[in-house]
Every structure is written in structure tokens, then in C-alpha cells.
């Protein structure tokens, strides 16, 4: 584990011993910004360079936020759950998952059923200049990169692991708010703009 200090950020822990230079430089740039003063900064072991921030970065915020620190993959995370054993093999389950869930750049040909229940998402998509229908066709799909669905067995039980993401929608939300901050002459949003 590394413990780092910058001009303002004095309580930073990186939960790995070796960090690539570009990521380390980005971490120090945040520790040298007053946004990191008097708050704990924690960096997860899978850290690597992102946009204005490293992946795996966590820090409480109060009076300001940099949209790029929230990131372009809003909702990204990993979840795990135990599932009932099925009569089919893991290979058959994998085949069914691949048939049912669009992956990579693919999306649904019809709207996800959630579309009829969520006017808030439609309003947000419209606000940031995105076609809500396109957003709804991406719901319940699996992006590319390091996103995955995995079924495994441990101690006689079956588990499903899913690394989720927001697809292009998260990128567009971030771009909208970053442009708003830039229009205000800052990289941060303050108060009601957050």
C-alpha cells in the first residue's frame, strides 16, 4: 500500500504497491488541488489512468464537483449474487446469456420494458441532447472493454458476477456537465449546478 501526500490532500491511501506513472501523476494533481483538503482519498488496487482522474478513485465531496471525477461510466460497478443451480451446463447458460443480452457496441432492436416506467431518465436524456429511445435500447445490454457477465461455481454454489456500466449515456452526461463547468470558467460545478 502507498500513502501519498500533496499540497492539500494529506490522507491518501493507494491499495497497491506499484502504480503506473501516468496514474500516479494524476493522483498527485488531485492531491495538489484544494478539493482534496481535509478529506480521505482512497485509490483501489485496480487503479489506472482515466480522464482527469484515475479509475478506482474515491473521495467525499462537499461544495464542488468535477464532472470528470465522477467519470464517463456512471453506474460502473461489480455485483455478485448467488443463483440457484440449473440443470443446464455453464456452457449452455453462457450461450443463452450471449443470445439474450446484446454486447459490445450492440443494442436492443426494441425498447427495454423499463422505458415505459421512467420519465426521469427520458427527461435527463433530453436535457443532455440524447435521444431517449437510443438510451432505452441500451438498457440491459453489456458494454465492451472490461465489462463482463460471469457465472461460476464455488463451494457447491453458483454465482453470477456482472461488471456494469452506463454505455454511451454516462459519457454524454459527463460531457454535458463538464461543458457546463467550463462555460462557468471552471473545471468544477458548485452549489445548485452540482
Residue ranges with predicted function:
Residues 54:
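A short acidic (Asp/Glu
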Residues 158-159:
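Hydrophobic residues embedded in beta-strands of well-ordered beta-sheets
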Residues 50:
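Positively charged, aromatic-enriched nucleic acid-contacting surfaces
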Residues 1-41, 47, 57, 61-69, ...:
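Glycine-rich, flexible loop motifs
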Amino acid at each position: 500500500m502507498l500513502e501519498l501526500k500533496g499540497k492539500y490532500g494529506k490522507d491518501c491511501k493507494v491499495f497497491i504497491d506499484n502504480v503506473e506513472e501516468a496514474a500516479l501523476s494524476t493522483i498527485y494533481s488531485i492531491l495538489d488541488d484544494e478539493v482534496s483538503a481535509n478529506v480521505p482519498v482512497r485509490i483501489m488496487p485496480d487503479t489506472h489512468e482515466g480522464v482527469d482522474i484515475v479509475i478506482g478513485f474515491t473521495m467525499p465531496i462537499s461544495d464542488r464537483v468535477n464532472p470528470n471525477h465522477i467519470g464517463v461510466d456512471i453506474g460502473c460497478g461489480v455485483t455478485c449474487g448467488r443463483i440457484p443451480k440449473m440443470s443446464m451446463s455453464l456452457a449452455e447458460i453462457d450461450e443463452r446469456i450471449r443470445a439474450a443480452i446484446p454486447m459490445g457496441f450492440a443494442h436492443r432492436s426494441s425498447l427495454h420494458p423499463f422505458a415505459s416506467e421512467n420519465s426521469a431518465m427520458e427527461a435527463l436524456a433530453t436535457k443532455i441532447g440524447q435521444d431517449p429511445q437510443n438510451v432505452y435500447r441500451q438498457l440491459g445490454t453489456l458494454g465492451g472493454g472490461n465489462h463482463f457477465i460471469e457465472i461460476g461455481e464455488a463451494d457447491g454454489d453458483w454465482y453470477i458476477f456482472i461488471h456494469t456500466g452506463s454505455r454511451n449515456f454516462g459519457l454524454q452526461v459527463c460531457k454535458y456537465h463538464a461543458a457546463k463547468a467550463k462555460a462557468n470558467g471552471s473545471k468544477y460545478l458548485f452549489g445548485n449546478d452540482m
